[in-house]
Every structure is written in structure tokens, then in C-alpha cells.
């Protein structure tokens, strides 16, 4: 299951991703797609599993704590309440990026801690929900999404064009973005 490919803006990172990106781009040729900005922060997931709310970093299920940045974002965005309201009696994960002061050198350049979603995952069926389902959930529940670069009906970009897009993309703070993520529209 291909989930997305990052095109890094630095040349060394791009070379490391080249083979993976090329294969993924070939699979996506002619298919509907979405391109978003890669936020430079830390992976953060809010989830409901069997009625219990939890917060994870990329590799750890975190204990609830007001001192933990991940949990502070969950509280600030009322993630538990919003997920349970929108997906009653379902096991769902909202995957996103935590960024801001104290996170990965704050390369985005914001003044406060922030979260933006990039995936919805149905835990029971083990499948990612569509871009439109993510968009509707985030709109209805006022949860920020990763910045959208482009949505299209037929992916036909060359690797060089994708690199150009990634190299010139900026965050709203005018800092150069970490890169782009390309996904099937589903």
C-alpha cells in the first residue's frame, strides 16, 4: 500500500529518495493525486481505540501529561471530543505533524506550537480514508490540515518538475518548506 513519497529539498536527501520516488511516481502516472507541503516537525497521532483516547509520537504511545507537547495539542484542539463526535463507536487515528518552538529547530518559523493533520486511518479495516474524508473531517471539526499544493485528475509530473516544485515551496511564514508529499487521491 503506497502511502506517499517525500521529495526533500536538499540534494543529498533527494538522492536518497530518488529510487523510491521514481517507482512511486510511475505507479501514480495517469491517476488522480494530491500534493501537500511536508511540514518540518514531529509526527503526532491522536486516536480512539475501543473507546479509549490516546496520543502517539512516531514510535511511542505517550502518557497523558500537561507538560507533554503532543498532549497539549490534543487538549488544545479537543481531539478526543472531535474524533468521538465525528466517528462515534469507531476506532480511528488522526495522523499529523506537530511543529513550532522546541520541535525540530522550528524550521517552519511559527511563534506557537501547532498541529496539522495529513491522514485519517480506520484502525479496524486497516485502511486510510480518502482525501475528501480527511478534508471534510478537518473542516467540520476545525482541525488544521497540511498545506495543499495541488489536486489533480491525472498525475503526469516528471521527477525534475516535482523537484522544482519542492525547491521553491514556502510555508506561510515565508521559510522554505521541507518538501512535498504526493499521494493518490483515492
Where are these regions (language model features)?
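Core nucleotide-handling region used for phosphoryl-transfer chemistry
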Residues: 1-186
Amino acid at each position: 500500500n503506497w502511502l506517499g513519497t517525500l521529495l526533500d529539498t536538499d540534494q543529498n536527501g533527494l538522492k536518497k529518495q530518488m529510487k523510491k520516488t521514481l517507482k512511486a511516481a510511475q505507479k501514480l502516472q495517469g491517476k488522480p493525486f494530491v500534493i501537500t507541503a511536508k511540514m518540518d516537525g514531529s509526527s503526532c497521532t491522536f486516536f480512539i481505540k475501543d473507546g479509549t483516547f490516546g496520543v502517539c509520537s512516531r514510535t511511542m504511545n505517550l502518557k497523558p501529561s500537561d507538560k507533554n507537547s503532543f498532549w497539549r495539542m490534543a487538549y488544545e484542539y479537543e481531539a478526543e471530543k472531535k474524533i468521538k463526535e465525528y466517528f462515534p463507536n469507531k476506532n480511528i487515528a488522526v495522523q499529523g505533524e506537530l511543529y513550532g518552538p522546541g520541535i525540530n529547530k522550528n524550521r517552519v518559523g511559527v511563534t506557537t506550537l501547532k498541529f496539522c493533520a495529513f491522514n485519517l486511518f480506520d484502525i479496524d479495516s486497516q485502511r486510510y480514508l480518502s482525501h475528501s474524508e480527511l478534508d471534510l473531517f478537518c473542516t467540520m471539526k476545525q482541525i488544521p490540515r497540511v498545506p495543499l499544493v495541488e489536486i489533480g485528475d491525472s498525475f503526469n509530473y516528471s521527477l525534475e518538475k516535482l523537484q522544482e516544485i519542492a525547491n521553491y515551496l514556502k510555508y506561510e511564514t515565508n521559510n522554505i518548506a521541507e518538501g512535498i508529499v504526493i499521494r493518490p487521491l483515492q
